[in-house]
Regions:
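Repeated loop/turn-to-beta-strand initiation elements of outer-membrane beta-barrel proteins
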Residues: 42, 75-79, 98, 140-144, ...
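Residues that define the transmembrane beta-barrel architecture of outer-membrane proteins
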Residues: 40, 50, 60-66, 124-130, ...
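Outer-membrane beta-barrel "beta-signal"
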Residues: 65-71, 258-275
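Residue-level signature of outer-membrane beta-barrel architecture
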Residues: 70-72, 92, 106, 134-138, ...
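Outer-membrane beta-barrel translocator/channel fold
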Residues: 98, 111-121, 177-221
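Transmembrane beta-strand segments that form the barrel wall of outer-membrane beta-barrel proteins
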Residues: 44-52, 77-86, 115-119, 141-151, ...
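Short glycine/proline- and aromatic-enriched beta-strand/turn motifs that initiate or cap beta-hairpins
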Residues: 28-77
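Transmembrane beta-barrel strands of outer-membrane/channel proteins
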Residues: 44-50, 102-106, 132, 145-149, ...
């Protein structure tokens, strides 16, 4: 079962992966100006956030992780965009508003001890997530689609996310990005996280009925992230998101609530890697 300490260590690993994956193409393709070498500023810092223990949970976990990335990430100014634990994007293509690249991350586990109604259903192992994204930027608008597939741990199926972002330049030192989105889940994903097999129903201590969800859209969400430069070196990040389960996900006997909230805050320090 993954708790705060273990999840924090995974965050460290993800942060390290960001550095390594950014460094490799920089040396190989002589694109150090894009990825943050040769004196371009980088940022080091940490995030603390509150997130549901599992999809459909009423209870929440408080987690934290450090990061290091090129300055400007999350503002369209970096080749790396950290959107979530399972959604760290690496922009490899950028042309006339179009951009695309691979993504990586981690999908956390769900333990049957996380909630009374999960007792008897068994654990779901987390694992490494890989995929790709593509998007098109028109002025302050950014339209994107991404695919996420877990390749280690349990085979939990694939997930497609669609999002529309709008960037607001509130002042020379403050940026706000608002977004709306939805996620389409494969039948394997839906069965893993929202389904109840006949065997699980028989073993369920809560007496959950058998439930066989189909592939489809599982949620809709709205969120905002503020980036505030406190001074030339220090930057504050504030983020919040609300999502609601829909379709078969909302009808699942596994969930405790259709509503989920996510909130986080971070602080970073800017420095020059090479002077």
């Amino acid at each position: 079962m993954l708790r705060g300490g273990t999840k924090a260590l995974i965050g460290v690993a993800l942060a390290g992966a960001v550095v390594l994956l950014a460094a490799a193409p920089a040396g190989a393709q002589d694109r150090s100006d894009q990825f943050g070498f040769a004196g371009t500023p980088w940022q080091v810092g940490g995030f603390v956030f509150v997130t549901p223990k599992f999809e459909g949970a009423k209870s929440y976990d408080v987690l934290g992780f450090p990061f290091i990335a090129p300055a400007g990430f999350g503002q369209g100014g970096s080749a790396i965009d950290i959107r979530g634990a399972d959604d760290v994007r690496f922009r490899l293509i950028q042309y006339n508003g179009f951009e695309a690249g691979p993504l990586a991350g981690w999908r956390f586990s769900r333990d049957q001890d996380d909630a009374a109604r999960l007792q008897g259903l068994g654990d779901i192992d987390g694992g490494l997530v890989v995929g790709a994204y593509a998007g098109y930027r028109v002025g302050p608008w950014f339209f994107s689609a991404s695919y996420h597939n877990q390749v280690t741990g349990d085979d939990t199926g694939g997930l497609v996310r669609l999002a529309i972002d709008h960037t607001w330049r509130l002042s020379p030192t403050a940026t706000l990005v608002t977004s709306i989105g939805t996620a389409y889940a494969s039948s394997d994903y839906m069965q893993t996280y929202f389904g109840v097999t006949a065997a699980q129903s028989a073993a369920s201590l809560a007496g959950l009925p058998q439930f066989d969800p189909s592939a489809g859209f599982k949620d809709v969400s709205i969120g905002a992230t503020a980036t505030i430069a406190l001074d030339p070196r220090w930057t504050l990040y504030l983020t919040g998101r609300y999502s609601r389960l829909i379709g078969d996900a909302a009808d699942s006997p596994v969930i405790e609530t259709e509503n989920a909230f996510f909130g986080g805050a971070g602080l970073s320090y800017k420095f020059d890697l090479i002077r």
